[in-house]
Amino acid sequence: LPGIAEVMEYLHEIGVKMAVASNGKEEHIRTGLKRKGFEKYIGAIATKEEVENPKPASDVYLLAANKLGVNIENSIAIEDSKPGAIGASKSGATLILQTNDITKHMDFTGVQYAYKDVDLLETIKDVVENK
């Protein structure tokens, strides 16, 4: 996601816990995080391998929040996929939907997002200050 490195650095600086909630395999996620230098920011990884129902269910988000020891209602989910957005929306987290070239033409009707296609860092700052 464009701007995610700046978001992670900002959240890390102010002490916000971060997790990855993914339908991918943990091994692949860890490799990607390490390659991008993001592993130092991530306190937990929750994957479809650990839950009964993967995205678009909310299970992986709930597990990620549980692993971090935080309440899902106080969490922010940043998503760029329809299944992820549906799952995040169902979880009770504040959803920031950032579409990409593939997903920008998809119908997200029924997905309860707080923000869509915004300046990610500025939006995160606003949300964190108001949580």
Give the ranges of each region predicted by the language model:
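Hydrophobic beta-strand core positions in alpha/beta domains
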Residues: 19-20, 97
